[in-house]
Amino acid sequence: MPELPEVEVTRMGIASHLKDRRIVGVLVRDGRLRRPVNEDLAELLVGQRIQALERRGKYLLLHLDQGQLLLHLGMSGSLRVLPRHTPLRTHDHVDIYLDHDQVLRFHDPRRFGLVLWGSNWFADPLLAKLGPEPFDSCFNGAYLFRRSRGRQQPVKGFLMDNQTVVGVGNIYANESLFRSGIDPRRAAGRISLARYELLARTVVTVLQEAIAQGGTTLRDFTHPDGESGYFRLSLLAYGRAGQSCQYCGNCLREVRLAGRSTVYCPHCQH
DNA sequence: ACACGATCCTGACTGC
DNA sequence: TGCAGTCAGGATCGTG
């Protein structure tokens, strides 16, 4: 489900409900995630107060008095703040009970997500190797150009690599390359500085638009408040294989790149 | 170092 | 209706 915009929409939706709340209980119904949830999570968390909810790439960091709870939504995860006695759905794997009768509930059918306690996640290999945030000034065309020299990898895979830049998954990689007129199959090392400058600006614009529209709702992604994200209506490439290009009217084509569905316009993208 | 495929897991959907 | 096959927004690991 979530790329950077969906994670950021989640963060914005729940951060104010979490700030200064005290954790009064924890229930792990199924701790078998990408890595096992800490077995003693309740002992570790109960009594601590929540200071902030921060995002780094597609990771969320819940800052508590004595450390941080690292959260990742994987492909199918979601995180909501609910009244404590809200009925359970299947795959509601972790509940963190808060004062004021609320619960922070982690839901993840495919269990590719993470819920892990630690004291310094920024030093952990999971986060330490991440590339820049797309909204940071060091993410720009010159950076992409420099980093891509000599690389034969298709530019789409290069853009989705979270050591290049964090947060750009399959949907937004497709959209950014479409809007930039760059063929996703083109070798990353053979794209000009000028085109990378356009691509970097486009990535930022696409992600910002998606956040402003509440993210992209496919299948079950909804806001923390249950609303849908409307960026799906703005998708020009992703999910539109076989339909006509909004720019030139030709038929959009689909190929698989690094195992991921890739949609592009053979006429507009080079 | 680099690029790719397989893999973790469940659910939705397709076609027979 | 049922069953097999395919695919899905991520990230890591092993391979050549």
Task: List each language-model region with its residue ranges.
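Structured catalytic/nucleic-acid-binding cores of DNA maintenance enzymes
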Residues: 1-270
